[in-house]
Amino acid sequence: YYYGGTTPVERTFGGRWPFNLYATNGYIVYVMQPSGATGFGQEFSARHQNNWGKITADEIIACTKAFLKAHPFVDAQRVGCMGASYGGFTTMYLQTRTDIFACAISHAGISSISSYWGEGYWGYSYSALASANSYPWNARDMYTLQSPLFNADKINTPILFLHGTVDTNVPIGESIQMFTALKLLGKPTAFVQVVGQNHQILDYKKRAEWNKTIYAWFAKWLKNQPEWWNAMYPEKSL
């Protein structure tokens, strides 16, 4: 797990990402603090500006490989990753850069920097800092080459997209278009919309279902136990 947005990862249990529950499900949990997070000084956070994943992806890939090398009891063929918001973007972008992950989960992630730039309550204000002085018309390479959507054909990792249907921060279209691209490319993927929820899943029952969805996806791809997922989301033929 890596950050949601650029909020620092805390050394806590419980909360939105209950690492202790993943451990009780038999997973080894590795939590990273990539560059760009706030709270570690201006130089550290400034690495996020006009970068959109380059440094972060390099760090996550290098750290994951180093962790696997240092802990040989971890099965390198069964590693999953997940993140939310900017961390959801990171999840998508990582899969365009590496195949070291057996599966991935993006919650409320950004798939196209150019569409997110003018969307939602936060798109423009967030981009004013994260993409300072860079716009779709004067920084075309960043807006396209760093956008997962424009690199969807490079993805082989099964990705689960989760998104609240009334997300005002990262509009749900960001997940819809990436899911559509991967389906057209014949890549393994799934998309679960959480009805009536915003950027965070706050309704108790819906949050419980959201958590179960995450566990079921990991069980399917990391434990070779698809039964839970299939029971929750049986295949449908149109």
What role is predicted for each listed range?
Residues Y1-Y2, P8-N25, V31-L238:
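Active-site-proximal cap/loop segments of hydrolase catalytic domains
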